[in-house]
Amino acid sequence: SCMKAAPMKEVSIRGQGSLAYPGLRTQGNLETLSGPNDATRGLTSLADTFEHVIEELLDEQQAIQPSKENKDADLYSTRVMLSSQVPLEPPLLFLLEEYKNYLDAANMSMRVRRHSDPARRGELSVCDSTSEWVTAAEKKTAVDMSGATVTVLEKVPVPKGQLKQYFYETKCSSKGYAKEGCRGIDKRYWNSQCRTTQSFVRALTMDNKKRVGWRFIRIDTSC
């Protein structure tokens, strides 16, 4: 999040959240289309197609999402994955959830949101961020909801063996405006800072008394 800009004379800086815009990759070739008008119609057709696909995926997600009465619902997290190998792409449910949250926050339909996409208008985010999968071996420890430091277990036992825990973390980029301040803030009059913020996710951990269990821990989730 970009820390709220404060006058140069002021010392305190307060935090302010920001929205993330997930990207969608399309497949297709427009070289066979003739002329700029055909190309425009082709892009519009592709956008309409993906709009319907996203709507269907969101409907399916809501249908299969565990109910509040289900005890396994506590284990549901879009940023944690159990897998035998490193995931190659961002979690699909995470992308869909971020996209839906933005639509709800902006009170927009998907069609209106698509035509007002900042990427289409050449806009840039206030703070640059990077996202990647992180293993429990790389995290080693984390802070739980009670403020205690716990050990993040690398492997989770399953009926047919073991799976590794992976966490999809987002943090401020070390390059660009992360150290120079928030993009769009006049540095002559205001101080600003991009800062990584955290959220809680469910993970298999062990406390200092060697008790193993599923706990909520803090991981980096936005900039």
From Swiss-Prot:
- Propeptide positions, renumbered to this chain? 6-114
| Principal location class | secreted
The keyword Iron-sulfur appears for this protein: no
One GO molecular-function entry? growth factor activity
List the disulfide bonds in this chain. Answer: 127-194, 172-223
* One CC-aspect GO term: axon
SUPFAM superfamilies linked: Cystine-knot cytokines (SSF57501)
Region forming the signal peptide:
1-5
What PROSITE patterns does UniProt report for this protein, alphabetically? NGF_1, NGF_2
* Domain of life, per lineage: Eukaryota
Q: Which residues are glycosylated?
A: 107
Q: Which UniProt keywords apply?
A: Cleavage on pair of basic residues, Disulfide bond, Glycoprotein, Growth factor, Secreted, Signal
* Biological process, per Gene Ontology: cell surface receptor protein tyrosine kinase signaling pathway; modulation of chemical synaptic transmission; negative regulation of neuron apoptotic process; nerve development; nerve growth factor signaling pathway; neuron projection morphogenesis
Does the UniProt entry include the keyword Disulfide bond?
Answer: yes
Q: What is the annotated localization of this protein?
A: Secreted
Q: Which family does it belong to?
A: Belongs to the NGF-beta family.
- Function in brief: Promotes the survival of neuronal populations that are all located either in the central nervous system or directly connected to it.
Protein name, per record:
Neurotrophic factor BDNF precursor form
